Amino acid sequence: MAERELYIGVMSGTSLDGVDTALVALQDDNIELLAHHDYPIPADLKQRLLNVCIGQPTTLIAMGELEHDLGHLFSDAVLALLQHSGYRAEHIRAIGCHGQTVFHQPTGTKPFTMQIGDANIIATRTGITTVADFRRKDVALGGQGAPLVPAFHRTIFHAEQSTVVVLNIGGIANISVLKPNGEVVGYDTGPGNMLMDSWCQKERNQPYDKDALWAKQGSVNAALLSHLKQDHYFALPAPKSTGRELFNLPWLETQLATFSVDATDVQRTLCEFTAQTIVEQVAPFAEGPQPQLLVCGGGAQNPLLMERLQALLPSWQVAPTTQMGVDGDNMEAMAFAWLAQRRIHGLPSNLPAVTGASRLASLGVIYYPD
């Protein structure tokens, strides 16, 4: 049996709703969440990131400053977690930091993915070995560089007689399909909270539609819904991945240009858009007497979205991962702690059947504090 080690995972997703940190104990395939902490992203930094993510012109100086500021933000988040938990830096084997994705283009003649946040700053400010840059080796091997979390899902959730699909609804929605035969499939289904949040910010000056109270006041516009679903992404075969570089507010405004739809009805339609594009990808994987859809991420807190998922999948059990004893709000941060452990010990951490990479690989670059 391997020695029990402590790792910290740091995750900042496409929704830009904060930095999630998780302190976990890892031993073989056993994982225990010891502490977690959410750290806010300052409004100015969030806006600068949004501008870059939607393709607004920038400069090398601005990008360098973002890299620096995110390094400080992520290290501040780790230090806050340590203070909150009572653990010290010397207790921690390593940090796994995803970084902030600012662009993701894994296809074409020059594929690349870009996550920023200087890991040298994280390692030196915290005094803890840091693993970062998890995605680019998978892209170099011909993969999408995403999703990386299905390998972690396979470790903690098991499909025995029926399919288990783990659905993470962050800014983008992605699925990990765990089949009874042991096969794993995973990819991004399309928008999660991203368009709903962006529209709510634009029309209501609120970061998100809490409890879907605004969306519940509206009605689905069938013509708009059909139009949104025509985007080329949904016809692409797996493996595939996407992000804010495609599904963003300018994209939505372009789709709305030929429609005259009340803002409230737009919000309700966006919720239905997310639900239907998820279900159309999930439903074909049903196997066994009781397939399960286990939901994590911010979307699990949206009662209307959860209601629609269950209504559209009547033969499935739809439930948050918390009902399985795993806190869905910390799932991705826990996953990057696990990915850091895999890198520290030189173990493979991608699933070529999921990402499309040519082979297994141990992902991430190690940064030492000394």
Curated annotation (Swiss-Prot):
Pathway involvement of the protein, from the record: Amino-sugar metabolism; 1,6-anhydro-N-acetylmuramate degradation; Cell wall biogenesis; peptidoglycan recycling
Record CDD domains: ASKHA_NBD_ANMK
InterPro entries xref list: Anhydro_N_Ac-Mur_kinase (IPR005338), ATPase_NBD (IPR043129)
Regions annotated as coiled coil: none
Keywords, in A-Z order: ATP-binding, Carbohydrate metabolism, Kinase, Nucleotide-binding, Transferase
SUPFAM superfamilies linked: Actin-like ATPase domain (SSF53067)
Gene Ontology molecular functions: ATP binding; kinase activity; phosphotransferase activity, alcohol group as acceptor
Enzyme class label: transferase
UniProt-listed Pfam families: AnmK (PF03702)
Presence of the UniProt keyword Disulfide bond in the record: no
Enzyme Commission number(s) of this protein: 2.7.1.170
Residue numbers binding ATP: G13, T14, S15, L16, D17, G18, V19, D20
GO terms under biological process: 1,6-anhydro-N-acetyl-beta-muramic acid catabolic process; amino sugar metabolic process; peptidoglycan turnover
Enzymatic reactions: 1,6-anhydro-N-acetyl-beta-muramate + ATP + H2O = N-acetyl-D-muramate 6-phosphate + ADP + H(+)
Job description of the protein: Catalyzes the specific phosphorylation of 1,6-anhydro-N-acetylmuramic acid (anhMurNAc) with the simultaneous cleavage of the 1,6-anhydro ring, generating MurNAc-6-P. Is required for the utilization of anhMurNAc either imported from the medium or derived from its own cell wall murein, and thus plays a role in cell wall recycling.
Family (UniProt): Belongs to the anhydro-N-acetylmuramic acid kinase family.
This protein's name: Anhydro-N-acetylmuramic acid kinase
